Amino acid sequence: MLTLRFVSGSIEVHGEAPDGLTLPPLPHAAHDDRAGCLRAPAVAYADIVRTLVRAKVPFIDEARRYEQLDLKVRAAREPRPFQTEAIDAWRAAHGRGVVVLPTGSGKTHVAMMAIAEKQRSTLVVAPTLDLVRQWYDLLGSTFGHPIGLIGGGEHKVLPLTVTTYDSAHLHMDHLGSRFGFVIFDECHHLPSGAYAHAALACLAPFRLGLTATPERTDGRDFRTLVGPIVYRKEIGDLAGEYLASYDTETIAISLSAEERAAYDEARGTYRAFIEKHHIRMGDPAGWGTFIRLSAGSTEGQEAMRAYRRQRELAFTAPAKMQYLGHLLHQHRGDQLIIFTQDNASAYRIAREFLLPVITHQTKVRERSHILKGFTARTYGAIVTSKVLNEGVDVPDASVAIIVSGSGSVREHVQRLGRILRKRAGKQALLYELVTEATAEGYVSERRRDHDAYR
């Protein structure tokens, strides 16, 4: 008799098919000489079971340790039509796949509907502790059950549990058999190196990925890890009815003659170095190559200083700071989020305009205090670098000002999403401040290559 076992993030298949039956090829399984059995990554569990059932080969399943639950939704609300469509599409894909919905449109409600339907032990994986806390609270209020938590110094495993990607990667080798349903929030993180292990080492037959921005520049996808994209709506599909209506405005900022000369000189030094060494900054490895080569010579160190100088001139030009002050005055009755590309720019703006600032260096208690003050309108504006791009609910924000940013389409769409939470009479507005005739122009064009900006 065949026996399936879960061992260290993998499925072991022991024994042989009964006489008269032929064991079919099992998906992703290969013979492990040391263990004397077939072995496959745990993610292949459902496919292996399906293959054996179809071939009518009997087996003993010692792998799965998850429970059938009896969850009741405490205060069910009518789903929006697109949420019902998303669940229908996911169900049609046998409970595996990715749902793409804009920030603020109710992705988490889709997840609650899926949990209530499948009634299996469920693990929710999220990228940040802030998001983990939001899921923890939402699961508890929705189902009225104790919720497990792994991460941030906690380690309590229950039939409904929330964890971070980092903790899931570390613990899935021994927890991967305890959940029949796994939800990956912000699942565009999932294909990244170690994070993929969290999906590969889990045997959950049912999987749901949630994201507003599924595309990755490295070409990796999540079909094997969680399933294909089964449903998709963009910001433009939902704006006005389910998301706030919005406008975007790009403001051209000019350098002074003196700043222009300094920028051109620094830019020239930097460009000369990367051209001399044939460094392609558009390639995924370009930045790492530049760092490595610039550290090895005086010429390279000068190129790195020049690179930082030209960025500083473009990111925080005096005219840009002046226009930012104008916008702060113009929108003094609104709730604003000011985004920058780096911490130095964020701290400079915070000092100049006496605004609270949140970066990855901000302590949890201080960050919580600032966000509560923003919600209570004690603070009319907050400054941040990248840490608020995703995973923090700021429903009162209605104006975003992009002082600087990367060329990432995902980042730009995420920043727009911060201000699109629907509220009666709300008209959201995103400003992008771009220093003319600098690399910012090209970066702006790249990041605005999305339907939300057309």
Per-range role (PLM):
Residues 93-115:
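Walker A/P-loop
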Residues 285-363, 367-369:
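Conserved helicase/translocase motor-coupling segment
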Residues 133, 144-157, 335-339, 344-350, ...:
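Conserved helicase ATPase core of P-loop NTP-dependent helicases/translocases
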Residues 188-247, 265, 272:
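Post-DEXD/H (motif II) to motif III coupling segment of the RecA-like Helicase ATP-binding lobe
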